[in-house]
Each structure stands twice: as C-alpha cells, then as structure tokens.
Amino acid sequence: MDLVLRDARVIDGTGGASYRADVTVEAGRISGIRRESDGGPRTPRPTGARVVDAAGLALAPGFIDMHAHSDLALLRDPDHSAKAAQGVTLEVIGQDGLSYAPVDDATLAQVRQAIAGWNGGGPDADDGVDFDWRTVGEYLDRLDHAFEGRGFDGGGIAVNAAYLVPQGTVRAGVVGWDDRPATEAERAAMERLVAESLEQGAVGMSSGLTYTPGMYADDAELTALCRVVARYGGYYCPHHRSYGAGALRAYEEMVALTGRAGCALHLAHATMNFGVNKGKAPELLALLDRALDAGADITLDTYPYTPGCTTLVAMLPSWASEGGPGAILERLRDDASAERIRYVLEEVGADGCHGVPIEWDTIEISGVTDPALAGHVGRTVAESAASAGEAPWTTARRLLIEDRLGPTILQHVGHEENVRAIMRHRIHTGGSDGILQGAKPHPRAYGTFPHYLGRYARDLGVLPLEECVAHLTGRPAARLGLRDRGLVRVGHRADLVLFDPDTVAAGSTFEAPRTLPVGIPYVLIDGRFVIEDGRRTDVLAGRSVRRGG
C-alpha cells in the first residue's frame, strides 16, 4: 500500500455516524478501513508507505461541486486553488445552457462573447486557451491532456470534471439566436447533437432559461430533448425561467416537463429570491415533496450565501437579447430601443430580472473585462450613477456598451431563511455557481464548501456535520451515477479531503473574495496529494469524468 491515514474521524458520505479509523490507500483507491472499534493492533506501517497522522482531523470523500463555471479555468490555470483548496475533487461544468461544445466555428465565436463575463475567453482574449475542439468528446479529451509536457506532475487538470450538454449552445448552432420555435428538422438536429454529446461522455443537459438563446425554447422542444437525455440515463439541470415573481410557476414547469419526458431533474441554484419570495422556501419544498412522493427523481443544489452572481446583460428582457451579442449591442446603441429596455427593466419587470422591476442599489459590479472600467468594480450601479451625476440606466447602458456585454454583477436579493430551509432538504446538494472572473468575484467561488462546514454545520447547527458532508459527497455522486466516488469505502477512488472540524472556514469574503480557506490541510485525488500541509502541490491528477464512469 502507498499511504496510511492514521486515526482519522471518518465521515463516510452516507450521512451515518462518524467513526475513528485507519484508512489505507493503494494504487489510487481505498484499500482498507480499520475501525478503532474493531480492536487489535493499529494498521502497521508497510515498507515504503507514507503515514499521515490524522488525529483531530475529519476524513471525508472529496467534495463535488454540482454547479461550476470552470470550463476555461481548468484549461487556463493548472493551480486552480480556488476549488482544490476547498477540498473539491470534482466539478460539474457546462452549466446554465452555455458552454464551448458542441460548436461550429461561428457558434464558438458567439458563445465566447456571450459568456466572457462568466469565464473570460472573449473573442479578443489571449489567455492561453486555444479552443482546438468542437465536439464534447474533443473537449473532454482536451481536459485529459491539458498540461501534458508542461513540467507538472501529471498532464491533466487540477480537479476532476464532468460535463453537461449546454442546450443554449446546441440551439445556437442549429436554430441561431432568434426568438422563434424550432422547425421539426431543427428539433431533430438538436436531438442528434444532444445524443452524440451524451454518447461522448456528457452526464446530462443544462439550460439557461433566462439566457439567450436557450430561453427561446418552448416546453415541447425541451421535453423532446429531455427524452433523449433520459434514454442515456442522464439528468436535466435547468436554470429555470424565474427566481423572482414567477419562481414557483417556473419550478412547476420544470417538474412537469421532466415528468412528461421521464427524465431525472436537478434544479440549479434552487433559490427563492427578491422581496416577493421572502419566507417562501417552504412552498417550494412542499411542491418538490409532492413530486418526490409521486415517484419523481429530483435533486437540487444551492450555495450558502444570500447574494447571487451573474452578468449585467442577463438582466435585459429576452426580446432585447434576440439575435445574439451583436444584436444586443446594436439595440443598446439605439436611443429608442434603449429607452424601451429601460422602461421594461425599471417600470414593468423584465423576464431577465425574473419579472421584478430592477433595483439598481442591489446590483453591484463585480468585474469588467476592460481595465479602463475597473473603477466601477465594488460599487452598485446606483453608486456609480450618483458619482457621475446620471441616471442608473445611463450608467448601466454605458458599461454594457463599453465593456461589450462583459460586466459581471452581484445581486443582493436573497433571504437567509430561504437559504437555510432549502439546504436542510433531503434532496439538497452543494454547488458553488462560482464565477472566477472579475476583480471582486462572489466569495462563493473560493468559499462555498468550507462555508457549509464551518458556518452552517459547526457554528449555526443548521445541519449535523455528517449530514452536511453527505450533501457535498455521496448524494451528488449518486446523482451523477458514479459507482466508485463520493464515499469512503474500500474499492472507491481515493478522492479524499482531511479537514479540521474545529477550524475549517471560508477565507473568502465580499471584501477579499480570493482568500483561500483555512482548516483543510490535505486533499487527495486518485490517492495523490493536490493539497499537502495546506499548500498546493504540482500534482495534476484531475481528468474528465464521463457518463457511466
């Protein structure tokens, strides 16, 4: 055997009681678990094996981030401590219906501009990513060999990654960016693309139903695509049509749609936001309980913070986004069109802003792609507008034009009681929704998992520690259909994290969002240390995790 983790408090990912044990690792897998209660001598030190004294530390499966935006970060940054230092050993990317495969050349260029605020990688970016893939299989292969020959210990990526087929990208490549129903031939073409992507290893399909162009798909189109996903045993992960005024209706739509399709459902960042939803999480959970009791297969993820994070352009009404990024900029430059957008945003409530009239004092600029605009970062749109002596919409419009739709934002619209109620639920998992771009990203990107463990489990007692760990490990592994991950069990892959239950905490704050966590001294992927004594090693043990893997 290669490694002995001695005298650890094992929290195995099932939600059951923890226990003290020696855990051995050999050839990248857990080879033995000797519980203290078993009696007899402790596990001897084998010749050549390393022994880590884990007394006082909890040993858990590596954490699974069910909602990540590291699609390019994994290719750009071999260190990727934003996730590795949290104990994350697997991320699910391809989220919110927009990512970089499957694509043709034209669609790739459009998608790069559309989500530069999430991931960087805009059309003019020179950040070391060469975009030399077009299919999902080619993208996953690229992850597997991202840093070969670059002098690291391993040539893959920092942590493992699973991929969802992005429905909006599929629609962009087949239908375009127009607001119209797909023809029968177009629907068939989209079904083929989704099927091919699942055959190449995608674990399911995502949608962004407040983002262009995925938002233009009707229920019939989405149901047809979900039937394809169901045939392959995948799941549908929608960012649904409203988290505000129409939130419950939007959740009902997703439950009904996947029920008709016979498809498993995973609700992305399942929140109830804005003033209209304060204290309404129990209504959502009652809806889900009824569906679960009737036999539906549903899970969800959340992050343990009240503010949200997205792009400023996502706030616009859907008609303003028709035609894609170039058409959006044309409308913003046209005074009459811009005034129509302002009226819907401020006085009616745009679907992009979840049907709620926008409150500019809750919209904080967290990042821009143009350094000349950096003075706006960390200020609300209302504050920037006041400094310039202009109306908030004037400031927002100018930022969108000058930064070519690039600004990212924090939305201060959540409610603590809703966050706590949803994280207690039996189908809850953890997902950071971590956007790594911008000068002041949301701290969830660097802090979600230690924040669950330190603040919500230990300090507030919202969840017992063993149950909290299950939400972050065993439960998401089951949703992904992973047979040998997510549990501390003999034969499982040694994707493991050792943390101090007494000190683990997120270091990231809204003021210093890139500060790394404390209390997580060791993280292993395939039995190899990616975090050792609290520091990132040069090990790149991560690979793509494909459907059925």
Region locations from a protein language model:
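Divalent metal-coordination and catalytic microenvironments
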Residues: 8, 28, 56, 67, ...
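Active-site neighborhoods of metal-dependent hydrolases
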Residues: 139-143, 151-184, 190-211, 256-259, ...
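Histidine-rich, glycine-flanked metal-binding segment
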Residues: 1-4, 10-62, 77, 506
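C-terminal cap of metal-dependent C-N hydrolases
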Residues: 334, 421-427, 432-433, 448, ...
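Divalent metal-dependent hydrolysis catalytic cores, especially in the metallo-beta-lactamase
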Residues: 83-102, 106-129, 158-173, 200-213, ...
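Acidic, glycine-enriched loop/beta-strand segments at the rims
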Residues: 11-22, 407-413, 418-419, 460-469, ...
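Structured alpha-helical segments in the cores of large, soluble enzyme domains
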Residues: 189-202, 218-231, 247-260
